[in-house]
Amino acid sequence: MRVGVLAIQGSVREHIEKLKLIDGVEAVLAKDKNTLLSLDALIIPGGESTAIGKMIVDFGLKDAILKLNERKIPIWGTCAGMILMAKYIVNDDKVHLGIMDISVKRNAYGSQLDSFKTKLIIPAVSNNEIEAVFIRAPYIENVGNGVRILAKHQGKIVAAQQDNLLATSFHPELTDDLSFYKYFLRLNS
C-alpha cells in the first residue's frame, strides 16, 4: 500500500518513520500532483496550517487532494492537517480543503508553552490507552451528520472520522504507538 505524507512543511519525517515500521506499507514523500494521485492513502501532517494551506494552493496540490477524497482514498489530518480538512474554522473565514464536516477551533489548547501529553482511551482504535501529544492543538467544536466522534479530552472532541477521512488534534507520530496508523490503514479496505 502506497501511503503518502504531504511533504510541504511540518512533521513529515516523523510520519514517514512510523509508516516504515508497518509491514506492507510503502512510505512516500508526496510533493507533487502526480505522486498524490498515485497514493492509496494520504497523511496531512501537523505544522502551521496557514502556511501549509497557502502552499497547497501555490504548488497546485489542492485539486489532487480533492480528487483523492472524491475517490474515497483515506486521508488523515493530524493537528494542522485537521484544520486544513475542516469545513469550518471558528473565527476564521479561510477554509483550505473543506472536505470534512467538522468545525475546528485553532490553537484551542493555548500556546506552545501549553503543550502537553496525556493518555486517551479510544476503543475504536485500540484496547490499550493511547499516548496523545498536543502541541498548540486545535479541537473539534462541532461535527456534522455522518461524522463519528472517536475521542474526547476534557469534554472536547480530539479525534473523529467521516467515511474515508480521519482527523486528530494530537500527534501520534511523536509517540511509539502505531495504533492510529493501523486504524487509518484499515480505512482503505
Curated annotation (Swiss-Prot):
Pfam families: SNO (PF01174). One of its GO terms (molecular function) is glutaminase activity. L-glutamine binds at residues 47-49, 106, 135-136. InterPro entries: Class_I_gatase-like, PdxT/SNO, PdxT/SNO_CS. The keyword Metal-binding does not apply. The active site is at 79 (nucleophile), 171 (charge relay system), 173 (charge relay system). It catalyses: aldehydo-D-ribose 5-phosphate + D-glyceraldehyde 3-phosphate + L-glutamine = pyridoxal 5'-phosphate + L-glutamate + phosphate + 3 H2O + H(+); L-glutamine + H2O = L-glutamate + NH4(+). Pathway: Cofactor biosynthesis; pyridoxal 5'-phosphate biosynthesis. The keyword Lyase applies. One of its GO terms (cellular component) is cytosol. Its EC number is 4.3.3.6, 3.5.1.2. GO terms for biological process: glutamine catabolic process; pyridoxal phosphate biosynthetic process; pyridoxine metabolic process. Belongs to the glutaminase PdxT/SNO family. Catalyzes the hydrolysis of glutamine to glutamate and ammonia as part of the biosynthesis of pyridoxal 5'-phosphate. The resulting ammonia molecule is channeled to the active site of PdxS. In the presence of PdxS, forms a dodecamer of heterodimers. Only shows activity in the heterodimer. This is Pyridoxal 5'-phosphate synthase subunit PdxT. It comes from Thermoanaerobacter pseudethanolicus (strain ATCC 33223 / 39E) (Clostridium thermohydrosulfuricum). The gene is pdxT.
